[in-house]
């Protein structure tokens, strides 16, 4: 598992940051969606709560994803940001992981948003790359 440095964690925790999670189904059909709820955990993993949506369906078929995270928009070649390459460790439809994620979402987005969450996903970070890498 790749290590998340302090700069990456700080960017996750910055209000107004922008994040896009890219997934693909078992046939390679891509999907990208804006997410504000991904967050780093103490063990270096990343968690997110998902509704029954295309992202969740894709992750059930293909465990690989990329999270694109930037400080702010508009994005330029100088905008601070990273690409985090992820692999699903687990998809939790019940139990303490889902409960913790729903609690976090309830606290930050309200109980209605939390009640829509169908699964909590835990990712291992396999690689961290800068937003812009020539080569």
Where in the sequence are the language-model features?
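Binding-site signature for planar aromatic cofactors or substrates
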Residues: 1-135
């Amino acid at each position: 598992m790749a290590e998340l440095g302090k700069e990456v964690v700080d960017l996750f925790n910055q209000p107004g940051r922008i994040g896009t999670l890219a997934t693909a189904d078992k046939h390679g059909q891509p999907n990208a969606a804006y997410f504000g709820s991904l967050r780093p955990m103490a063990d270096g993993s990343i968690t997110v709560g998902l509704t029954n949506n295309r992202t969740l369906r894709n992750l059930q078929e293909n465990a690989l994803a990329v999270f694109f995270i930037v400080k702010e928009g508009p994005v330029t070649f100088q905008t601070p940001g990273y690409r985090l390459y992820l692999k699903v460790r687990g998809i939790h439809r019940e139990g303490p992981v889902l409960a913790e994620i729903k609690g976090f979402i309830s606290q930050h987005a309200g109980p209605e948003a939390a009640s829509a969450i169908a699964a909590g996903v835990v990712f291992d970070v396999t690689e961290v790359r800068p937003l812009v890498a020539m080569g």
